[in-house]
Amino acid sequence: TEKGKAWIHATPISKEVFKEHFFILSKTFSAIFSEGLGVVSGPRIACLMLERISSDMNIWDGEKGVRNTLVNEIIRLANLVYPVEGKGYDTIPLDMALERGIVEFDDVAGELVFFTCVSSINTPEQTEQMMLVVSGMWNSRTSSLSLTEWIASLPTLKPVASSGATASTLSATSSTTQPETDSVTSGQIPV
């Protein structure tokens, strides 16, 4: 986000929600791949494709429309995770983060809808393989961990402090040099 580094943790939709929306999810998934969009642009445009197909079928708007049922459920199942200096990580439900302007709907909706299409249409093995390709292009990760387990798997937050050592000016590392790890600090995301 513009306010700092953060991640979205999303949970797949339930079988009941899939049964209610299988047709529109299948049409969206098929359209992404039959139009040659695939994993390159699919995560960016999946929500737009869902909206177009749903609108063409006159099922996008309204109380029982796809926007108010499926899309709201996808958002409900997602959380924004951000680092807090001295505390570790904190979360806020994605719908609240959207309401507060911490993240923009258009910045997250495509990837969330794409993930939902992929994870609900395919077998777990197919989903894993497809999302592995997506993660390389879109800097995302797929995991079966719950939100709490996933946060626990993140690196421990440590303030950047001087070690007293002189920084190396070499641009190359030797094979005996341990790789340096990135230090994660506060994302300064207001909640």
Region spans (language model):
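Short, surface-exposed, charged amphipathic helix/loop patches that serve as local interaction elements
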Residues: K15-V191
